[in-house]
């Protein structure tokens, strides 16, 4: 039998989400990209890692917020405001750099400290899930946040020859717009005052940002391959006392291949969530 699942737009109660996606989170994948990489109604569009994500629950639901208590709500509000401000600072720095220099070369180096701080600070997303103040999957959140950390620390930070690649700008722009939208959405929802534009942006920007973020991440990893293969960085060769081998070059190839099944699945999932929230569509799901 079919199971009828209704999802009407929830105003301030809905949440949305790579690799990075982010999003969701990709996913997220980067831009796509939390509160835990899950559905657009619960997580990140970030896909993307580009910020993308999968399914989660509504953090801002009034009943859930009452259960959170004043302290947890105050902390989440502070956290979301701080993250919104941080990514705004990053956006302003990127615009100023390009206006002054007229080129993307040197951009990453000029903003890397801010990027590393706020993206690493997002590890608290996992803590929020672990202690239960955000009712979403620890695993899904961990995957999304870790994917962003991976891109920041193990790719662009560690492989300096690729820092001036245009693909780096692609995922940086996608991440930045996604995160400003996402965290401002969370903030206004917690304050019970969600402007329609923020809600609209949350459920529409990912349509472009998620593919852009994913493309930027993939192209950046691809650009890193020759350097990784030549230097053997992060690889473990046999023989060694642990009798273990690891090849970072092939790990990156596998990582890139993983985008093939994940990207369409997460992207179309987010499109369904968009229809639910913005248009109040009724989705009929068939039981297996």
Swiss-Prot record:
Domain of life: Eukaryota
Pathology linked to this chain's protein: Congenital myopathy 11: An autosomal recessive skeletal muscle disorder characterized clinically by severe hypotonia apparent at birth, motor delay, and walking difficulties. The course of the disease is non-progressive, and affected individuals achieve independent ambulation and tend to show improvement of muscle weakness throughout childhood and early adulthood.
Bias (Low complexity) ranges: 7-34
Molecular function in Gene Ontology: 3-hydroxyacyl-CoA dehydratase activity; enzyme binding; hydroxyapatite binding; very-long-chain (3R)-3-hydroxyacyl-CoA dehydratase activity
UniProt catalytic activity: a very-long-chain (3R)-3-hydroxyacyl-CoA = a very-long-chain (2E)-enoyl-CoA + H2O; (3R)-hydroxyhexadecanoyl-CoA = (2E)-hexadecenoyl-CoA + H2O; (3R)-hydroxyoctadecanoyl-CoA = (2E)-octadecenoyl-CoA + H2O; (3R)-hydroxyeicosanoyl-CoA = (2E)-eicosenoyl-CoA + H2O
Tissue specificity statement from the Swiss-Prot or TrEMBL entry: Isoform 1 is highly expressed in the myocardium, and to a lesser extent in skeletal and smooth muscular tissues including those from stomach, jejunum, and bladder. Also detected in gingival fibroblasts, periodontal ligament cells, osteoblasts and cementoblasts. Isoform 2 is specifically expressed by cementoblasts but also detected in periodontal ligament cells, heart, liver and kidney (at protein level).
Protein name listed in UniProt: Very-long-chain (3R)-3-hydroxyacyl-CoA dehydratase 1
Primary enzyme class: lyase
Gene expressing this chain: HACD1
GO-annotated biological processes: cementum mineralization; fatty acid elongation; long-chain fatty-acyl-CoA biosynthetic process; positive regulation of cell-substrate adhesion; protein-containing complex assembly; sphingolipid biosynthetic process; very long-chain fatty acid biosynthetic process
Topological domains annotated Lumenal: 96-114, 160-165, 222-251
Pathway(s): Lipid metabolism; fatty acid biosynthesis
């Amino acid at each position: 039998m079919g199971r009828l699942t209704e999802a009407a737009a929830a105003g301030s109660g809905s949440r949305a989400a790579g690799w990075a996606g982010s999003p969701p989170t990709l996913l997220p994948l980067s831009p796509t990209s939390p509160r835990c990489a899950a559905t657009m109604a619960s997580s990140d569009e970030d896909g993307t890692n580009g910020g993308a994500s999968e399914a989660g629950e509504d953090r801002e639901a009034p009943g859930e917020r009452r259960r959170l208590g004043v302290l947890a709500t105050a902390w989440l509000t502070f956290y979301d405001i701080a993250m919104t401000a941080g990514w705004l600072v990053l956006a302003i720095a990127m615009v100023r750099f390009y206006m002054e220099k007229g080129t993307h070369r040197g951009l990453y180096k000029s903003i890397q400290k801010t990027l590393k701080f706020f993206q690493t600070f997002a590890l608290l997303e996992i803590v929020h899930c672990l202690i239960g103040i955000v009712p979403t999957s620890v695993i899904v959140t961990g995957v999304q946040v870790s994917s962003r950390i991976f891109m920041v620390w193990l790719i662009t930070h560690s492989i300096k020859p690729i820092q001036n690649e245009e693909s780096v700008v692609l995922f940086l722009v996608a991440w930045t717009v996604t995160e400003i939208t996402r965290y401002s959405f969370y903030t206004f929802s917690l304050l019970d005052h969600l402007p329609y534009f923020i809600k609209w942006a949350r459920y529409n920007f990912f349509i472009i940002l998620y593919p852009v973020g994913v493309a930027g991440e993939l192209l950046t990893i691809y650009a890193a391959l020759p350097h990784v293969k030549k230097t053997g960085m992060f690889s473990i060769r046999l023989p060694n006392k642990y009798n273990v081998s690891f090849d970072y070059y092939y790990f990156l190839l596998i990582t890139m291949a993983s985008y093939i099944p994940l990207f369409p699945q997460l992207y179309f999932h987010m499109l369904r969530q968009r229809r639910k929230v913005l248009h109040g569509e009724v989705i009929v799901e068939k039981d297996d």
